[in-house]
Amino acid sequence: MGLHTVIAIILAALVVPLTQARLEAQERRMTQEQIIRDLIDQVPPLTHPRDGALPIRGSRLEGWLPEGDEEAKQILRALDARGLALCAGINPGNEAALAQALRMGRLQQELGLEVGVHASRAMYSFFNGDESTAHLADDGTPFFDDSFGSRKMGCPFRLDGRKDEIKAQFRSFLAPYKDAGITIDFLYLDWEIDGPIEWNDAWEHSKRCTVCRAHIPFIDNFLGFQRALRAVRSELQRECCVQVVQEYFPDALIGNYSVYPHGGIRYWYDYYEKLPADAPFIADQLARYRPWEHEFVPSGYTFANPVVYTWYDTWSWYPAWANDDYRWFYNLLLVGTNAGRHTPQQVPLITWVHWHTTAPPADAPPVPQMSERAYQELLWHLFLRGTDGLMMWCTAEETTKEVSLMVEVLDGVLGHREFLGAEPVLFDVPTEPGSVVSALRSDDRLLVRRTDFGDNPGPVTRVVAGRVVTIPRLDGECQVIDLTTCPPAGR
């Protein structure tokens, strides 16, 4: 037997089990129907009805209903009883998908439920690989930035020619909804790796581009570069999505993943983002927080959509703390507080969340999972710092667990209905593991939550509206405190 034959036999022996494992994994992958039915089977209904509060939506809550209308309505009712809502998935050019979307919208409307749409595919792609969207070198040669994976990212200032096609993709489903008498109440995008983005190698590519240099006189200043790109990105979203949707449905809630009011800093990185060399940052232990341009108002969106995920790198940023949960909680609360503190109360704040450790690199060493208790406490604090509703991204197999944790907290929040829409008044994020306190104020009453990451059994105090509020330790519970019983500060 020759050497080549031996090698071939060995390779075949290795490939067979790998192929079999891959097939078995595919067979185990849950379908949308299995996901929805499992949620109904495993997640208990709310004990406090929504009655107008925002439902939970997410990446796995869309796209499927049974064929019969009556059974489909039963599914929609069962999900609503659990605080969950489906969105129709839009796929421009796919008539079958459009028919399914219209049917879902009709049934939701007949039941008095909000009609939701996930329209990300209508927003793709500005950078479609055509040379008309490329950067231009000094000699006129087109070139692309390949630091964002498979998408060919080009020149931010050569995208006007793409606007009409993107607008047409939105009109291709908006007009049929309108013609069918179905009102879209909620529309969201997850529009990420497309259009102008300043991270990865974008800055260096733009410095080489004659068009970029002409549009950004101070291109060597990263903040000037960032401002110019985010202005174009906001314009694309406003003109091609928001304004077009509002022509048909002026009262729709419209938002995009990761676009929200903030204080000028972003405390997290998406899975594809890297800080360019020489770009400014704020250090916090090993974390590098980034300056971020204000894009929510220029984009025109009508709900804020921050992202509070357990990104894999987050835990490793804070080695000074032995408390694993606080290494997660601290960063996630910074993100949620940043949005809650700066989003006007009249603007719905709908927060993306995810509990399972998010986007670990292949072959990366494991990190401690955030505990269920700490995650649910985080959700409580998000609500008490201004979040009005939740969305979730997760894998199919994670869905039931993720939703269960969220629904349990939502039910608890609904048990304090009189505080829904109340004013958040406490935004401190402790820089050491200790007592975290958040509160909503309704007239002279406070709904308070205290969560401890230390051994302090005694009360803590906070000042609200000029009064000293004493908060005893009460693990896992909220407290309602009458401000009029609290002494004035300064005495």
Regions found by a protein language model. Name each.
Residues 6-17:
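Bacterial N-terminal signal peptides
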Residues 17-18, 210:
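Short, low-complexity, intrinsically disordered N-terminal segments
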Residues 21-25:
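Boundary at the C-terminal end of the N-terminal hydrophobic targeting segment
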Residues 26-491:
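Glycan-processing catalytic domains of CAZymes
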